[in-house]
């Protein structure tokens, strides 16, 4: 609260005129972040609609990495949090999920988004080298490739990912994982496991 007060050029105690405590401030910040998630109009294709919704959640969490820690750590009662939860629940219910299956699907897809953002965080925030210079990154890449040379599968994998733009690679990984996750949920629906 002291740092926030200093940033606002006021005392830490002035912040308490607006919020009761740090937890309330975090709740408000989380709800404001969730306001950034666009709720797409339903198209009738629950998978496509859920992909769009979760893509928005991923974009928001990538822009505000601190939200991944807060998402399930406290109840979210703000209007934007409730709006988001309602949209996701409606999509899953329209697909046929109910009861424990609805709860599992709801939390699993959000946990997947949180995990993908957390896993990508260090790759986004840290350059390949401490200096961040292109020449140092290239030297590090060459060293990693040399270290992989005795291992054919690893060498081929490193060559493949080296050819991709980092953000594009992270997006492809997210899309692949989400597709597999939705395939599994679809299979459960087909098998009638949603009681």
What are these model-predicted stretches?
Residues 1-24:
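Helix-turn-helix
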Residues 26-28:
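Short, Lys/Arg-enriched C-terminal cap helix and immediately downstream tail that follows
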Residues 30, 58-79, 87, 118, ...:
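Amphipathic alpha-helical segments used for helix-helix packing
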Residues 32-36:
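Short, basic, alpha-helical segments at the C-terminal edge of helix-turn-helix-like DNA-binding modules
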Residues 38-83, 99-109:
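Hydrophobic alpha-helical connector segments
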Residues 84-140, 166, 185-189:
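Hydrophobic alpha-helical bundle segments that form small-molecule/ligand-binding pockets
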Residues 122-195:
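C-terminal peripheral helix-coil segments that are non-catalytic and often amphipathic
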């Amino acid at each position: 609260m002291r740092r926030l007060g200093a940033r606002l050029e006021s005392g830490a105690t002035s912040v308490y005129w607006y919020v009761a405590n740090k937890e309330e401030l975090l709740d408000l910040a989380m709800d404001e972040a969730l306001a950034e998630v666009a709720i797409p109009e339903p198209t009738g294709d629950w998978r496509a609609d859920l992909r769009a919704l979760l893509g928005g959640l991923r974009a928001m969490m990538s822009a505000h990495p601190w939200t991944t820690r807060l998402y399930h750590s406290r109840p979210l009662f703000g209007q934007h949090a409730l709006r988001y939860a309602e949209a996701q629940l409606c999509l899953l219910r329209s697909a046929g999920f109910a009861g424990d299956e609805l709860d599992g699907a709801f939390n699993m897809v959000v946990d997947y988004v949180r995990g993908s953002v957390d896993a990508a965080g260090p790759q986004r925030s840290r350059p390949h080298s401490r200096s961040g210079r292109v020449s140092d990154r290239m030297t590090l890449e060459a060293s990693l490739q040399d270290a992989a040379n005795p291992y054919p599968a690893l060498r081929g994998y490193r060559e493949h990912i080296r050819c991709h733009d980092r953000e594009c690679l992270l997006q492809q990984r997210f899309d692949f994982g989400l597709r597999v996750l939705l395939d599994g949920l679809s299979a459960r629906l087909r098998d009638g496991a949603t009681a």
